[in-house]
Each structure stands twice: as C-alpha cells, then as structure tokens.
Amino acid sequence: MNQFTKLIAAQLNLKEQAVENTLALLEEGCTIPFISRYRKEKTGNMDEVNIEAIAQANEKLSEMAKRKETILKTIEEQGKLSDELKKRIEQCWDATELEDIYLPYKPKRRTRAQIAREAGLEPLAQLLLFQRERNPEQAARKFVGDKVKDVEAALQGAKDIIAETVSENEQSRNQIRGEFRRGAIITSKVVAKKKDEEEAQRFSDYFDFSEPLKKCSSHRLLAMRRGEAAGFLRVSISADDEQCQDKLKRHYVHGFGECQTLVGEAVDDAFKRLLKPSIETEFAALSKQKADEEAIVVFAENLRQLLLAAPLGQKRVMAVDPGFANGCKTCCLDAQGNLIHHEIVYPHPPRNKKSEATAAIQRMVKMYQVEAMAVGNGTASRETSDWLHSIDFDHPVDIYVVSEDGASIYSASKIARDEFPDEDVTVRGAVSIGRRLMDPLAELVKIDPKSIGVGQYQHDVDQTQLKKSLDTVVMSCVNSVGVNLNTASQHLLTYVSGLGPTLAKNIVEYRRENGAFASRAQLKKVPRLGPSAFEQCAGFLRIPGAKNPLDNSAVHPERYALVEQMAKDQGVTVKQLVEDKALQKKIDIRKYVSAEVGMPTLTDIMAELDKPGLDPRGEVEKFEFDASIKEIEDLQVGMVVPGIVTNITKFGAFVDIGVHNDGLVHVSQMSNRYIQDPSELVKLHEHVMVRVAEVDLKRKRIALSMKGVK
C-alpha cells in the first residue's frame, strides 16, 4: 500500500481502496483524463476533480516526506535527535507543526540568545524561568566575568534566552496563531507622497482601508497586494498586541516578584521582536496563498467555459478584424479553416470608403460562398457589426461577434509564424478570430491562457500554480471533447492524453508522409508511440468516416472485442449495431459484467453506441446588441438591455452591452436570493438581459443588475 493512502483518504473523505488504486494508476504514468474515463471500476467512478485532488495531495505529502528527511538529518548532525523527537517528526504530517518542531534546532544567524548562551547564561535564564529566586540580581552576580561585564548584562542575556525560548515554543506560537485567526486585521494605507499620482487612483478604495482578515475576500486582498507591489500602498496584518501578550504571560508568569517582572519583560520582548513579526509574515503568506488559490479556481473555471464554448463547425467563414484608420482586415477561410483570401476594406472614418467596402464584402461572400462572419469585439466592433448587418447578400450569412482577447499574442507567436510564414501579424490575428468561431478549443489552445482575458489578478498570483492549474484544465477540455486525428494541429494533439509535444509532432509528420489515418490501430506505426502511449491516447482520438465506427467514438480499443461480442449476440455487425437504436435497447449490459468491466464502463459504451463521437459543446448562438445603444452616453438608469458575459470573478460578472466599456453586475445584484458565487447563475459568453443601475461617465463605469430581469 502507498504510504500516503490512509492520510489522503481521510483528508479527502474518500475510500481507501479507491485512493490506493488511483495512486497506483498515477504511478504507472496514467493521465487524469484516462483514469477518469477508462478506469472507473478501479477508482469507484471518481471524476477528474477527485483524481486531481489525490494527485495534488500525494505531491504535497511527498514534498513533506523529503522535508522531514532533511530535518532529521540536520538534527542528527547536531547530536540532538532523541528517539522521542524522531518519532514525533516521523508521525507529523502538518507543515506548520513540522516547522514548529524544527524551529529550536534550525540553523540560524547568530542571535542575541546564542551570544548569551555562549557567555554561560543558560542556567541563569532557567533560574529566572523557574521563578523561585527572590533576589535575581544577587543570583546574576555569579555570572559576571570576562564574557559578562555586569549584573545588568547578565540579566539582559538571560532575558534574551527566555525570549527566544518563548518564541520557539510550539504552544506559544499556537496561542498567537489562535489570536490571529480570531481577530487579525488587515490594514492598507496610501503612501503619502504618492497619493496624488494618477496611477495610484486605481487603488483609491484602499487608501485608508481596514477589515478583519477572515472576512477579506480574495480579490480585495490581491488588489491591496498589487497596490503594495506598485509602491502606492502599505499593507499590514496584525492582531491585538495586548491580548497576545496577556495570553503569553498567563502561561509563563506565575505570581508576583522580581523574577516574574523580568520574565514578563522577556515575554513582551519575545512577542514584539520575534513572535509578532514571524506570525504576521506567516499569516500574510497564508492569506496570499488562499487568495491565490481562489483566484486560480476562478480563472480555471472561466478558461474551461471558454474552451468548451460551442463551435460553429466546418463552415466557410469570413473573419473580420475591425478598425478605423487601419481599416477592417478580412480573411476568407474554407470549411477546414484554411486561409484562401484576405484583403483590407475601409468603411469607417477617416477614409469613409463604405460603398467600396460594401461591394468588396459582397464580392468575397459570393466568390467564396461565405456562410458566416466572425467579427472581432475590439476597436470599431460595434460599428463594423452594424454595417455588416446592413449589407444585402445573395444567400443567408450569419454574423457573430467573437472575442479578440489574445489574438494579437497569437499573431506574433512562433505557432502563428509556422502556420503563416508569409503573412503579417494582422492577417494571422484575423484568421485566429475566424477559427475561434469555427472551433474555439482548437484555436485557443495555441494561446497562453493568461492572455485570453478571463482571469482575476492572474499576474499577481503564484505563477507556477497558475500554469499547473491551467494546463490541467486545457488537457481536461481537449480530452473531454476528443480530437480529430486527421485534422488536429500539432499544438492541439500535444494536449491529448499520453502524447505531449514529441509524439504530437511525430503524428503530424506521419500523417504528412502517409496520408490520413484509416484506423486507430495505425497509430502504432508512428515512431516512438509505444503500447503505453497508445493505451493513454487512443480513446480520445477520433477518425470520422473510419471503416470501424468505434474509431470515431470514445469507446477504447481495449473494449472493441466486447462491443463485437454484443453485436455478434444480436446477429449483426458493429456498424449495424451502431446504426440501429432498437437493437441497442435489446442489449442487457448486465450480461457483460466481468472482473475487468463493470456497469460504469458498460453504461459509457452504450452511450457512445447511441451517439458515437458526440460533441458535448452544443451549438453556437447568434447575438445582437440593442440597436439604439452605441455609446455609454446613450445609457439611462433603468434601461433593460441585452449583453454577453465576458468575465466572471468572485465579486460579480462583467457584461458587454455594446458601448465599448463592460458593465459590472455585482454578486449582490445577480438575484433576489443570496448568491455566494456568480458562476452559480451565469456562464462565460452567456447571453443575458441586464438593467442599468448606475452610470459614471467620468470614470467610464457602468453598474448593472439582473434582479427581477427576465
């Protein structure tokens, strides 16, 4: 059994056997999507969230085990590792407690207490702590000598030793932590000499701010930390000093007298000089970590919604990157997303060549049989969209507004240069907008998630944890949808379970040299793609039109024989079984349960036979803004207008209502009932109706409400 199984099972409230099996699969190199989809019997039908939690817990415990090895070695080298201490360290699995145990033995720079110990004052410190000496000054005289010049120095040295002892005592530290947990206050003040700077005004809400730390939301804490990093704010976390000191004294000072006074002074010094700064730093780090985790969860959920946005599918698309002076960049794409034509038109000021631009658009739509248009949502988007809606075409053309976030990042990237070496960044950016409409997932995986514009303080959080979380989300989304083996880009294939950059490149090269894959089994001919990689990736790769219909489904090749047996028992071929719903309903899956295959897998197989290769993302919806509203000045309080959710945070949702500035629906304005998390009510890119609650023309801020709006 894995050494961490019991700990993880208890921590996550999961069954030990399921945790043990999951850890074994992870150890074998299985990916989370693979385990979740194809090893349900072993995991007890766990979802990706639980499997990811097990993987993270195992990683943390492994790191702690390594830390314990270092600690044990260090203490042993000092000759201070007793059997009791060793046992305590080995049994400890709380990071804070572990560091507290280690603190008295931790190598540190030469402290006042160490200097006092070197001067032989440890016995005097113990004498004072015992608090039975009636005349401490007289006792201190015995310690005056070469290293201690007088009684005062002796007593001060003893107090320094007591202060360090108190500050390194586990109970003392936990007492102060308790006070901080109950009553710590986070305070933010403006740096006086920077108060009037324009950039500082972004943090004006925090110029004189104070709040209990336990009530401080993640977005407020991250905003304060950003202001602090920029040099505009001073942020501190503190508890009630007097209460903390009283608590310590109740533990260390017994009765009244000269000894007690000296010990009390040492305790006060321990708190102010050593304990308080240490615990403040600890709580600052813990609160930042908690805020980071919350912000990363928000970002990850937004990214998931964005990646799983409904695709238009394989249709001929005209992509339009709007602009005024630089014109509107138009790119015509075929149904596979290949660039077949591009040109620039100038319908807006300052050139105002609207009639020529209209004629050019009509010509391109007819020539390339354009079925849909993707209009970027940046500069001149509203004007361009209105203009395109006014044009008459000889066949129906649907017009969609598409987010441009990150398109400019993509257009200058190596991926874009490799795809379009002969085109400039404007063409590449426009192509990306068009492809996002056709298949958001396939296009957005090419862009650094942090550039997609759906985060909350994404540049302020732990970047390593953020990248880890977002990579996990991308991989989860790619594998939940499945990937067309014959059309997927190298970059998209990289995220398929079991592949990675090298095998993705090898697949694309094999495809280029040998033509389209006819079956999943052919994957085994790809250089370096061995049995393990095949097992991990095969179920997530699709081959539309394959001879075996299972090759275009989520049924894993390891279960083909089972489906063939089902078909044989019905007296038909697999192809006939897939095409005949009535036959499928006749199958009693309980007959096919075995030691390896249980009801969860069989249920999944039947769902795939019913709708093989079904895309879970749904269908794209058209949207139009209120035609009477084009600028923020057109808004009036009380108006009810349509909008698109562009970003979701812990404090609310931002909604584009077509006036160049997104409005905010604060979480308190989302419903008449209490809402803890905005994502309970809205999804990214959801079409919503909102009421204008407030308009601040000077600051270009719009407050919106969804209360009572249908």
Q: For the regions a protein language model found, what residue spans apply to each?
A:
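Short, ordered loop/turn segments at secondary-structure junctions
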Residues: Y38-K40, L129, D240, P322, ...
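Low-complexity, acidic/Ser/Thr- and charged residue-rich accessory regions of DNA metabolism proteins
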Residues: F143, K149-V151, F209-S210, Q245-F271, ...
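Accessory alpha-helical DNA-binding modules that contact the DNA backbone or grooves
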Residues: T31-I32, T43, D47-Q114, A119-K149, ...
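Duplex nucleic acid-engaging cores and interfaces of nucleic-acid transaction enzymes
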Residues: N50-A53, K60, M64-A319, A325-D422, ...
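C-terminal accessory/binding modules appended to enzymatic or scaffolding proteins
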Residues: N13, A310-L312, M475-E509, A627-V665, ...
